[in-house]
Every structure is written in C-alpha cells, then in structure tokens.
Amino acid sequence: MLAFTLRFIKNKRYFAILAGALVIIAGLASQHAWSGNGLPQINGKALAALAKQHPVVVLFRHAERCDRSDNTCLSDSTGITVNGAQDARALGKAFSADIQNYNLYSSNTVRTIQSATWFSAGRSLTADKKMMDCGSGIYASINTLLKKSQNKNIVIFTHNHCLTYIAKNKRGVKFDPDYLNALVMYAENGKLFLDGEFVPG
C-alpha cells in the first residue's frame, strides 16, 4: 500500500510538472506565430516594433511574372502582370501603414523594378544588379545598402532564390517563397541576422 501511494504521489508530481510545461509552451505560442516552414511570422505591428529597436531590412520576392502567367502583362513581357502590379500596390499600402520611413532598392530586372515601383507608389528607387547575386556575397551587398541609407530601414525587391538561400543559410530551413513573400533581417556590428518571415496583417 505504501509503495502504491509513493508511486501515485510521484506520478502526480510528474503530471504537475508536465502540465506546467504545457502552460508555458501555450503562452509562448500565443505571443509568437510560426510559419509552417519553421520561420517566425512577423506582422506589420511586430515589424514596426522591431524597427524601433534597430533598422530593419525587408527583402521581397517580386510580383507575378508575366512570362510565367496567362494573366495580362503590365507592359514588358519580362516584367510583371497587371494582377501582380495591383497586388504590389495593395501590399505597399498595408506595409506603409506601419513602416513609413524606408529607402527602396531592387535588382536591375524589369520585374523587380516594376514590383518596387508599384509597391511604393512612386517613391525614389535605386536598382542594384548585386541583388541578383544570391550566394554568400549578398550579405556584403545588403550591408553596403544599409551604409548608403545611413542605417535607415530598407526594402529590397529581389528573387526567390535569394530568399531561399538566406533562410537556409541563416536558420537552416527550407523557404520556397511565393510572389511578394518577404524575409525580415537586421544588422548588428556588420553581421546580418534573420528575424523571420514578413506576413502582412
């Protein structure tokens, strides 16, 4: 009887520990959403909070490509579709509600330039061909843009293979971005860190 009682008490103790751990995990989950790919999700409000701590770098994949869609082209066949332009404009409006102060960059392709232009509704844009080079050298290129921007927030329109590389290299996760998906980064002492995936809303 004594042995049974001791086992029961021990089991109750383990149960209490387990229940407490589950409560803690549930509390953390309520504060931080995670994408199915393993990246933390960062919405507009969270991005604005991060931007108060340090300049943020938001890297977007361009909008829907014309040459891979049956939808109507905006203009040039190497650019984006009309739908893609409208999606970029809507995203830009939502983004600017939380982040008004940023410098805008893109790679030097028609599709990224058009995406950035529609996203920003005419904000000054700098095209940089180095945003096409998506290996380890991309970090030096981003740091160069940060210095040019005097450590302001920066938005960069680039390509899916760049985002895939960064997610794998920085967090070891597989990220296959859709059109206009984005990653959020920041720099500290010249080193870039990946905060997570930007999710509007």
From Swiss-Prot:
<dbReference type="InterPro" id="IPR011310">
    <property type="entry name" value="LipoPS_heptP_Pase"/>
</dbReference>
<feature type="signal peptide">
    <location>
        <begin position="1"/>
        <end position="33"/>
    </location>
</feature>
<comment type="pathway">
    <text>Bacterial outer membrane biogenesis; lipopolysaccharide metabolism.</text>
</comment>
<dbReference type="GO" id="GO:0042597">
    <property type="term" value="C:periplasmic space"/>
</dbReference>
<comment type="function">
    <text>Catalyzes the dephosphorylation of heptose(II) of the outer membrane lipopolysaccharide core.</text>
</comment>
<keyword id="KW-0574">Periplasm</keyword>
<comment type="similarity">
    <text>Belongs to the phosphoglycerate mutase family. Ais subfamily.</text>
</comment>
<dbReference type="InterPro" id="IPR029033">
    <property type="entry name" value="His_PPase_superfam"/>
</dbReference>
<dbReference type="GO" id="GO:0008653">
    <property type="term" value="P:lipopolysaccharide metabolic process"/>
</dbReference>
<protein>
    <recommendedName>
        <fullName>Lipopolysaccharide core heptose(II)-phosphate phosphatase</fullName>
        <ecNumber>3.1.3.-</ecNumber>
    </recommendedName>
</protein>
<keyword id="KW-0378">Hydrolase</keyword>
<keyword id="KW-0732">Signal</keyword>
<dbReference type="GO" id="GO:0016791">
    <property type="term" value="F:phosphatase activity"/>
</dbReference>
